[in-house]
Amino acid sequence: VHLSGEEKTALATLWGKNVADEVGGEALGRLLVVYPWTQRFFDSFGDLSSASALMSNAKVKAHGKKVLDSFSEGLKHLDDLKGTFSSLSELHCDKLHVDPENFRLLGNMLVLVMAHHLGKDFTPAAQAAYQKVVAGVANALAHKYH
């Protein structure tokens, strides 16, 4: 992902606000609510019967944090996202059989939830930078698909 110096600064500044704990679970929860067919990958997570159950589900929140921790690692390696996410791409392709379109959908949810949490600090320029990164991460996660 090619980012300008300004974009890299915006990413680092906003990521430094420590919203990852809240944002990951909320983004994953919203994905599961808005795109209910994605729930099939999480049948071991317990009650996914309603929006309320999804948004308060401890396993959804924990997995969302895990996703954001991986995303955070990607922010450290923007020049090698495919290498950074290679093993996760293989896992999601070969073992979990996740439709790679779901990565793009989750990235969009992440941007929306960050905008909600960060308010006016999430400027249009910051949004554009995050859109570039989530698109790059989605592409990297889809890399091992045949």
Curated annotation (Swiss-Prot):
The modification Phosphoserine is found at residue 44. Keywords: Acetylation, Heme, Iron, Metal-binding, Oxygen transport, Phosphoprotein, S-nitrosylation, Transport. The modification N6-acetyllysine is found at residues 59, 82, 144. The keyword Cell membrane does not apply. One of its GO terms (cellular component) is hemoglobin complex. Red blood cells. The modification N-acetylvaline is found at residue 1. Heme b binds at residues 63, 92. Signal peptide: none annotated. It holds the Pfam family Globin. Residues 2-146 form the Globin domain. GO terms for biological process: hydrogen peroxide catabolic process. InterPro entries: Globin, Globin-like_sf, Globin/Proto, Hemoglobin_b, Hemoglobin_oxygen_transport. The modification S-nitrosocysteine is found at residue 93. One of its GO terms (molecular function) is oxygen carrier activity. Heterotetramer of two alpha chains and two beta chains. Belongs to the globin family. Involved in oxygen transport from the lung to the various peripheral tissues. This is Hemoglobin subunit beta. The lineage of its organism: Eukaryota, Metazoa, Chordata, Craniata, Vertebrata.
